[in-house]
Amino acid sequence: YRIVLISDLHAKEFGAGNEKLIQYVKDLHPDLIAIVGDNGAGKSTLIKVIAGFLQPGFGHIYLNGEQVTIPSIREADRMGIASVFQGQEFCDNLDVASNLFLGKEINQIGIRDDDSMNSRARSVLKTLSSAIRVGSPIASLSVGQRQTVAIARTLLNDPQLILLDEPTAALSVMQSAEVLAYIKRLRSEGRSVVMVCHDLPDVFAVSDRIVVIRQGHVTGVHRTVETSYEEIIAEIAGVTTEHEYEEIAENPKFDSMVRQRKLIDRTISAAVSHGTGHDSPLD
């Protein structure tokens, strides 16, 4: 998918008293795109609108050059758009396969077809090279494994665009690296991925482009290999002077970021080369 969001796109957050302006005049090419910005900048609002979770008051969304209306998550799913938001719900008394198909069960003549669902569940988990067993109770999985199941669930309808809202939130460095390896596989299969993420080491480890949003406006779109932590943080913070930029560049936190990114890069490389799991998904 190639996404174009035209200027003056408004969306009302649920429970909010007034409309929140988000202005975008950018092409998002078929890449693994990371959207970054401060809290309240409009990152999650943007992907909620594309996902059909929020409706724009006005403004336009174009997919592949055609103006579209996305009135619901169900319609987004039909259009080949899948999403994973924070706080995905699972039924702890069900296994992995049943959670993957929750609300989308396969039936044959009115009878639930567990064999077909298990087969399809193995297939989507194999796509991610995950060794999670389809018959495992979801309650037995770690936070990182649950996030993997949430990502696998997006693949059931073979989407062309996948939206991820903070996919590595609350994960350890090693868990994050494993989930990021799965996300890279989605991109390697030719799918477009748009990811909201606060953690810059994760952003730099997997993204092709970084979109910076500040106060509802896209302030820059950067090729990841051509930018730096300092430049992105300065843009997020609205730094305008050379002195302010130098203060950011000299911050000791950057050494920690660089070390964390190197660890993530090594872990992702190993996962991509050898597979994150040891075997194919089993019952």
Please name every model-derived segment.
Residues 1-40:
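N-terminal active-site segment of His-dependent metallophosphoesterases
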